[in-house]
Curated annotation (Swiss-Prot):
Family annotation (NCBIfam families): PRK14139.1 (NF010737), PRK14140.1 (NF010738), PRK14150.1 (NF010748)
A GO molecular-function annotation: unfolded protein binding
Quaternary structure, from the entry: Homodimer.
Name of the featured protein: Protein GrpE
Organismal lineage: Bacteria, Pseudomonadati, Pseudomonadota, Gammaproteobacteria, Pasteurellales
Any Pfam family: GrpE
Region (Disordered): 1-44
Cellular location(s): Cytoplasm
UniProt KW Cytoplasm keyword: yes
Keywords recorded for this protein, A-Z: Chaperone, Cytoplasm, Stress response
Organism: Glaesserella parasuis serovar 5 (strain SH0165) (Haemophilus parasuis)
Amino acid sequence: MTNQTEKEQVEQDVSQATELAQEAQEAQTQDVEPELQQNNEIDPLEEAIARVQELEAYIAEADKREQDIQLRARAEVENIRRRAEQDVEKAHKFALEKFSKEMLTVVDNLERGLQALEGVDESVKSGVELTHKGLVSTLNNFGVEAVGVVGEAFNPELHQAISMQPAEGIEANHISVVLQKGYTLHGRVIRPAMVMVAS
């Protein structure tokens, strides 16, 4: 074969290679375009899914906050109700405090009267004793209790120490003499006992 044939052969090979390259490029372009189209279609879908997940998380957080607010509100209402009940109970319990304090003066006077009645007619003395017992019993029925007994341990919440002195037969820091009885109303001190304490 001649140079011309070789030349034709080379031209033919180049032409074939060019055609193959063009076909390959077209095929590649056709393969890439659907991928790009799919990627473009997936991106909005993925964005929508991400947005839905974001909104679901926001709604879950909002529900959690709302439940927390409701729980706190219920607890606050319960606390207010309980405090109101306690206030009413205390008001009922301690409504008699002023009256009880005034009645303690009467009890003290009856006790002093009983001490002064030594050697007086027994019928008068027993009448005063019965009056004293009746009054003390009535006060006890309403929650008023006497505190401060000789030999009892000194308690600064219930007793007011006037002085300390040595006392035979009584332990240190125990009441040796009761100068004036103390009283509590449902456990609350309405008048401390005035006492002398053994040293």
